[in-house]
Every structure is written in C-alpha cells, then in structure tokens.
Design a protein with these regions (language model features):
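Collagenous Gly-X-Y triple-helix signature in extracellular proteins
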Residues: 51-233
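Generic alpha-helix initiation/capping and coil-helix boundary signal
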Residues: 2, 13-14, 37, 129, ...
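A signal for long, low-complexity, Ser/Thr/Asn-enriched, surface-exposed stalk/shaft
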Residues: 3-51
C-alpha cells in the first residue's frame, strides 16, 4: 500500500510538472513582426486592444468604408455590435442614404414562421437570401462580420427608454428630433402577435408598430453586425 501511494505521488508530480511546462511555454509564444522585432502573442493582443479607444452607444464608426453606429460596447470584449447608419439598397449590397421609398422591400416572400408571434426570427429556419434577414446576413459577411441580423423588438424597446440622449435618438430613428432629414423606416427581426405581421421602426409612422410582411414600399433592411473591434475606425 505504501509503495502504491509513493508511485501515485510520483505520477502526480510528473503530470503537474508537464502541465506547468506547457503553461509556461504558452505564455512565451511569439512571432516576428514585419520590422524584424519579436513580440509575444499576449503583448501583441494588448497592443491591439489599446489602439481601439472606448466608444459609447450612438457613436459613429466606420467598417469597410461604410458608416455604423455603436449599438453595444463592452470593454471586456474583443467584439462590438454595430447598426448600419442607413438602410441597404434594394439589392442588399451597400448602404444607401436615400428616402424610405428608395430602399423599401418586403420582409419576405411568404410567412415562413406560421402563427408564431412575438419571436425573434433572425435564426428562424425558413428565410432566404432575398428576404430582409437574408440580406442582412449576406451584407454582414461582405463586411467580415462574425454575425449579422436585424434589430429585435426587445432591443428597440430598451433603446426607446434612452432616447433622451440625442445620439441614441439619432441612431435609432435616423435623424435628430426636430432636425433636418428623413426618419429611417426599417424592418425588425421579430414577428408580431398579429398574424402575418412583423415589427417595424418608423418614428414618423407611429414609432414601433406591426406591418404585413409583404409590404414592399415603405420599409428597408438595416443590419446589425458583430465585428472585431480591430475592424472599426
């Protein structure tokens, strides 16, 4: 019995030593930069994060040559959630600073969620590339986003309690209160409790309200994308 305990102790000590060696090696992983200097991976990540200044909700940033608003910011995360400054064009390939009629499209070609109500459709099986959610996802991929979707009803509900902030008001509705320019009208990724209806945002059209999914003249696609902070400028 004593011999067994001694052997077990030796095995445990060996394993701990191996683990410690691997852990130490991991902290010493490094690579050579273009200027010939060597830097550890940890230091490189720290340097990268320092280059991205802290942002607030409603701040404007640029990704891939197009403008976005900061929707969520967490200093402890390497990623950030952004919402496009404008609706996408009808093809869904780029943002377009235009009146709502120019960017309007149907939410989808059919009701693929049935009678389900008050649910988030962003990951609901059934949407196609030509649907509003499909366009948002495709656009996000073109920007190198980790994920992309439409804004949800719950997110808008929370943001509306913060619209005493001019920057958040402008981010959500597309213009300042009593300011010049057009309000944005856009689809949300949430089904309404009314059959065949999906939620939309349009400050000049009653705020947040349900609309038939096949309405193609008034409401556009406004993507929410999740990207690495290193991609913003």
């Amino acid at each position: 019995m004593i011999i067994f305990i001694i052997i077990l102790a030796l095995v445990l000590c060996f394993n701990v030593g191996v683990y410690a060696a691997y852990a130490l090696a991991a902290t010493e992983v490094s690579y050579t930069k273009k200027d010939g200097t060597t830097v550890s991976v940890k230091d490189a990540l720290d340097e990268l994060n320092k280059k991205v200044p802290t942002k607030s909700i409603g701040d404007e940033v640029t990704v891939g040559g197009e403008q976005f608003y900061v929707l969520e910011w967490d200093n402890n995360c390497d990623t950030v959630n952004l919402i496009s400054k404008y609706n996408l064009n009808k093809a869904g390939t780029a943002q377009q600073d235009a009146t709502y009629g120019t960017t309007g499209c149907a939410f989808s070609s059919k009701n693929y969620w049935g009678s389900s109500s008050n649910i988030n459709l962003n990951d609901f099986i059934g949407c196609t590339e030509t649907d509003a959610i499909g366009k948002a996802k495709s656009y996000g991929r073109s920007k190198g986003a980790i994920s992309s979707r439409l804004l949800s009803y719950e997110e808008v509900d929370k943001l509306e309690t913060k619209t005493n902030s001019i920057s958040i008001y402008k981010m959500l509705y597309g213009r300042k209160p009593y300011g010049e320019g057009n309000y944005l009208r856009f689809w949300l990724g949430s089904a309404s409790r009314i059959k065949n209806n999906v939620w939309i945002v349009a400050k000049d059209y009653g705020g947040i309200r349900p609309v038939e999914y096949y309405n193609e003249s008034n409401f556009g696609v406004r993507p929410v994308i999740t990207v690495l902070k290193s991609k913003i400028s």
